[in-house]
């Protein structure tokens, strides 16, 4: 299970809404510090 998590964590995150919400919160905090990327 740990190996699968390292290889493809995104699927596990998307399957868990609580984890997804926390994941997005961390990304928002990260970009708030370094500045948002240009797409």
Swiss-Prot record:
It is found in: Secreted. GO terms for cellular component: extracellular region. One of its GO terms (molecular function) is hormone activity. Keywords: Amidation, Neuropeptide, Secreted. The modification Phenylalanine amide is found at residue 39. May have an important physiological role in neuroregulation. This is Neuropeptide F.
